[in-house]
Amino acid sequence: MKRICSIYRSPKRNEMYLYVLKSDVLKRVPPELMVAFGKPVHAFDLVLSPERALSREDINVVLENLDSQGYHLQMPPAEDDYIEHLPEELLRRNDPM
């Protein structure tokens, strides 16, 4: 089952994306979610199929959500996923002796 999907990014939260069927635009997205998401900014369109891999989402979950509720919300990664951890000597550089 192939789906043509429009992907929107949130102006409120970095790396938050909303996947919707291109034919539905944003009609099936609940108003409460739209308020929390902010005014959607179109990022790109994509053809989704079970064979296609997505970098941070399970394609089968995305397709199921598109079919059942009309949208899929991709949340930003957990903080630990994108924070660079500094070496111990840099962390202690300004510590008092």
Curated annotation (Swiss-Prot):
Q: This protein's superkingdom?
A: Bacteria
One Pfam family name from the record?
Answer: YcgL
- InterPro entries assigned to the protein according to its UniProt record, in alphabetical order: YcgL-like_sf (IPR038068), YcgL_dom (IPR027354)
Q: Give every YcgL domain span.
A: 3-87
Q: Where is the signal peptide?
A: none
Quote the protein name from its UniProt record: YcgL domain-containing protein Psyr_1564
Please give the organism: Pseudomonas syringae pv. syringae (strain B728a)
